[in-house]
């Protein structure tokens, strides 16, 4: 026994080796909650418009396909969980270059960055439109005869939002993700209120709860067939109609690609926390986006619903049980949250684009200027 203790003693008292990492920039790591909030900043915003857009093309069956897309998102997340931990210098550029060649690598990276560049400004302008509409409606309610130009005001708001999140990301992802987490919390509260309040409203109606569910009938519009619109044979094949309907609902996945970009910033234990990040994103998206789409179809009358195509949650707020003034207050709250989450989509696009450009710069594709750290913040 003494001999065994003597043998084990050196290994038990061995000192941990200290490692010093030399780097040109400051490392910053964030929690899985913050990482999830960054991705949801873009992914969650689709709840405002996805149901209305999909219904225009596929009819009232849209909520079922949106639910299917969000379940499919779990499979996409599984791919990210498997591929993101595999360190590949240069990221998507290096992977595509080694498999398809340099030209395809440049096209793929350019397309990805272009997607992020479009996402930010479009989301911020949309948020500006929501805010401008709310401001003009509020002034009208209080009898103030002043109406702001929605286009100019939305542009001004968009510029402020983009500059704000750009500066937050200059200070580091810890700063920008903190703002994203606050937006995520407010959005989660709003989503819970909408879904619970909506279910209660349906339960208190005379008809049975399940009688309100939309019928499982695909009614594709002429435009939804695209280049197959004149092919009558295609309209007779059910599988083609299902695939087209599914395709028109894929927009609900917008922003999910940022999940692969935030992996490097997730704190230790990295893979375990990354799995938690994916789980939070899945539970949030599979609840809010399809839930809003179903409630929009079940609560808002068919002849009124087209008015709320771009803001389905705002329409739901007006048909919830309760006094009219409470509906108006809740609708204003929904619009404000919409402005916030659309602003969060700007942060998501900046984080994603920054990560892609960093990977490409590390592979010496871009000049050294892109890798130059900030003098004050080291980012």
Residue ranges and their predicted role:
Residues 81, 198-212, 276-319:
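Extracellular/periplasmic helix-exit of transmembrane alpha-helices
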Residues 27-47, 161-164, 220-279, 330, ...:
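Hydrophobic, membrane-embedded alpha-helices of multi-pass small-molecule transporters
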